[in-house]
A protein has these predicted regions:
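Alpha-helical, largely C-terminal catalytic domains
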Residues: 1-408
Length: 408
């Protein structure tokens, strides 16, 4: 069972500001950083797998990313230099990690006893040599560096105490991961005149979703970014997938489908539903433009062999689909996926689950702002309309409506 407090914990990361003791050109949040990190980890692990012919345990990578996210959210009050110092001491690290596992035991056990056990094992494990953990660690430092480059550019280095030391430490940590070919290529690409191309161009473009605010024309607190929203949707879709007994490939697709479903918005901005539906045919016109922009500007940044999967995640993103072996185009299903489609070989994805999690995010954004006293009519109407649509929703046997009931 997905508990209310677990959802609130995830969402709270949207209010956790990063670099809040530095001058910043924009607000960086923990939720946005972790989203960027997970997309980077996907790129690094996939590139490394293809370059070396080594398989990726995608369940381990996804859950490892979720575990590290939860760990960081619980320990958010510890500043990074202190946090990393504590992690270097074996005894303190074990005590701290055991405390985090205990703090989340109730919520994670309610979700899945096996998942809670894997969380504890992950935190207490001393083995960090797997491709999955190395990819996550490299992605962590690259996402940190992406943010820090803005901080550094904005700062007067003569006035900002310790900023050169911070810069050097981040560079040192990244250099420790140059044995991963994707990291080497990304770092090399950053220094080229055409650095907007290739993997670095893709990751930099994705990071810019952190600057796009949701409900941009509506007063609301806390403000949330499109980038942070993507991680919330991906994690919730993964948890629902666990609840319905989804096969590994279906869980993979639901997580990364949720994490990447709004990728076209980096080119079109987050256009609110009332605007899309205000003129007949406008929604379809926007979809056509997004598809064209993806083909012309985003997909060329990625290896050709990856592009069909990105299309699978971003086109008809709210439809249930399968991709049987040999099929030239995905098969869009009229109904929810059933047991017959719950097979890795069919590459299934639950678009309706991703849509419900997407709308749950919007519903929570409206509900929380109203609860905090910022309640323009647009938020009240949005909350009411979303609840009316999803309060009784059941998808593939999972009662999505109960998640909306939590925040009414």
């Amino acid at each position: 069972m997905i508990t209310r407090s677990l959802i609130e914990l995830i969402f709270s990361a949207a209010s956790m500001e990063r670099w809040n003791d530095h001058p910043r050109p924009a607000t960086f949040t923990e939720l946005g950083k972790q989203a960027h990190k997970m997309i980077m980890a996907w790129v690094i692990a996939r590139y490394e797998s293809e370059a070396r012919g080594a398989p990726v345990d995608w369940t381990s990578l996804i859950e490892g990313g979720i575990f590290e996210f939860l760990h960081r959210v619980v320990l958010t009050d510890i500043k990074p230099p202190v946090f990393h110092k504590l992690m270097q001491n074996d005894e303190q690290r074990r005590k701290l990690n055991s405390w985090v596992a205990d703090a989340l035991a109730f919520n994670l056990h309610r979700l899945s006893p096996a998942f809670a056990a894997r969380f504890r094992d992950f935190l207490l494990s001393e083995d960090e040599s797997s491709l999955e953990r190395k990819s996550l660690r490299a992605a962590h430092y690259l996402a940190t560096k992406w943010e820090f480059d803005f901080i550094y550019h904005w700062s007067n280095t003569k006035s900002m105490f310790g900023i050169e030391q911070t810069r050097g430490e981040i560079s040192r940590q990244i250099n420790e991961h140059r044995d991963l070919r994707a990291v080497e290529e990304i770092l090399a690409a950053r220094e080229l005149p055409d650095r907007d191309m290739g993997l670095w161009g893709f990751l930099s473009l994705v990071g810019q979703l952190g600057f796009q605010k949701r409900w941009a024309q509506t007063p609301r607190i806390p403000q949330t970014s499109v980038l942070g929203h993507l991680l919330f949707v991906g994690m919730m879709a993964y948890f629902v997938s666990m609840e319905i007994g989804a096969c590994p490939r279906r869980r993979y697709n639901n997580f990364f489908g949720g994490l990447l479903h709004d990728l076209p918005e980096v080119l079109t901005r987050d256009i609110i539903s009332p605007v899309k539906k205000s003129v007949e045919g406008l929604d379809e016109l926007i979809k056509q433009y997004e598809k064209q922009a993806m083909e012309e500007r985003i997909l060329p940044l990625l290896p050709e062999s990856w592009r069909d999967e990105i299309r699978y995640f971003t086109e008809d993103e709210f439809s249930g689909k399968i991709r049987p072996a040999g099929a030239k185009v995905p098969v869009i299903l009229a109904n929810d996926l059933g047991e017959e489609e719950n097979r890795d070989s069919l590459d299934p994805i639950d678009g309706r689950i991703i849509e419900a999690c997407d709308k749950l995010s919007a519903y929570m954004e409206a509900s929380l702002s109203i609860r905090l006293g910022v309640a323009p009519q647009a938020l009240a109407d949005g909350k009411q309309n979303l609840y009316a649509r999803f309060s009784r929703s059941v998808i593939s046997g999972f009662p999505m409506g109960q998640l909306f009931d939590y925040f009414w």
